[in-house]
């Protein structure tokens, strides 16, 4: 009897194992051979229609393990059009008879005419797909997203990797901001301010030369549209207050003229307070400058003062007039530090922030 029970239990265990193995194989996701692996999506608006540009991986042979190489035919760009973004994506899919798989999506490029006032509607195709990473990068293009995604760069395995590396490096070195999908999906209305990097095709790489793409501008988006542009040459100090920044280029005045030095961000403290009955943004930034020579202390003081003046100027330019351009994220800081004050003014928050004052201190040390 015990042997029969043991045999029965063993058979049930084996049968259950087969069921689990079969089920787990189906839980691993869709069969990628039946999907178009999409690395980047471009969104343009032309004559009331959405124009989608999808950069996809295309193996040279069905089911092959072809390595991704933008110089070969295994990377392809598809174009689709429609009254809505899902319709435009469906147009891309009809051209190959396969569904777009967005689990590998790394970049969403926006043409200059795209309206960001309702980000949840615009990126609804991502919200409905659980495979999309919320850390996907967002960028604007100087002209059309199609032009950018059709510019094939060959220094990385896929063109998209070049764009991501460029955005990552320039954001860390205070040459542009960085914007992720989750940053925009968290906004519920059109009154938010967002900093979106701009990718610019400077050269398409004719005559066998590598294309040149730059990420040295950042669009300040308000009410869904870019209202001005921050430039790496003029506004790099402002990017030091962003969490993506880790270093920047500073200048010190010496007898021979301006001297350029690399500075590293060592610490940043930000808070919102009420001072003398007025809203005040307090900021303490610590940076370290490298290779300042014998008069390092004097140069460091000059660098700190210069950065401080630049930040004050950027604050005055952004937080004045009728509505604030919240480039330093004061609304979120206010919501965290002074929640009751935020609730009192949340319906007219940009107008309230435009009356804020700044208390900014920059300390530059010698490495």
Which residue ranges define each predicted feature?
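Membrane-proximal alpha-helical signals and transmembrane carboxylates
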Residues: 2-367
């Amino acid at each position: 009897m015990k042997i029969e029970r043991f045999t029965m239990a063993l058979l049930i265990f084996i049968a259950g194992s087969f069921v689990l193995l079969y089920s787990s194989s189906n839980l691993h996701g869709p069969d990628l051979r039946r999907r178009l692996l999409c690395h980047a999506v471009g969104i343009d608006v032309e004559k009331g229609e959405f124009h989608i540009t999808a950069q996809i991986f295309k193996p040279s042979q069905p089911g092959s393990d072809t390595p991704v190489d933008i110089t070969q035919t295994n990377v392809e760009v598809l174009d689709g059009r429609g009254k809505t973004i899902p319709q435009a994506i469906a147009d891309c899919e009809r051209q190959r008879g396969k569904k777009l798989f967005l689990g590998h999506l790394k970049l969403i490029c926006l043409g200059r005419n795209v309206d960001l006032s309702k980000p949840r509607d615009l990126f609804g195709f991502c919200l409905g797909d659980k495979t999309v990473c919320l850390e996907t990068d967002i960028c604007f293009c100087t002209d059309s997203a199609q032009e950018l995604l059709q510019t094939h760069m060959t220094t990385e395995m896929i063109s998209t990797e070049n764009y991501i590396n460029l955005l990552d490096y320039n954001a860390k070195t205070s040459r542009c901001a960085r914007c992720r999908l989750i940053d925009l999906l968290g906004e519920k209305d059109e009154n938010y301010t967002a900093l979106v990097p701009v990718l610019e095709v400077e050269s398409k790489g004719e005559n066998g030369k590598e294309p040149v793409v730059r990420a040295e501008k950042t669009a300040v988006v308000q009410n869904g549209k870019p209202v001005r542009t921050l430039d790496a040459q003029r506004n790099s100090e402002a990017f030091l207050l962003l969490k993506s920044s880790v270093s920047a280029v500073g200048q010190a005045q010496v007898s021979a003229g301006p001297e350029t030095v690399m500075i590293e961000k060592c610490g940043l403290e930000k808070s919102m307070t009420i001072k003398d009955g007025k809203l005040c943004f307090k900021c303490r930034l610590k940076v370290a400058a490298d290779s300042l020579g014998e008069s390092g202390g004097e140069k460091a003081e000059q660098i700190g003062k210069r950065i401080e003046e630049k930040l004050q100027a950027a604050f005055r330019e952004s937080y004045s007039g009728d509505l604030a351009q919240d480039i330093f994220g004061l609304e979120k800081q206010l919501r965290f530090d002074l929640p009751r004050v935020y609730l009192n003014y949340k319906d007219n928050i940009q107008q309230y922030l435009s009356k804020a004052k700044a208390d900014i201190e920059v300390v530059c040390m010698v490495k």
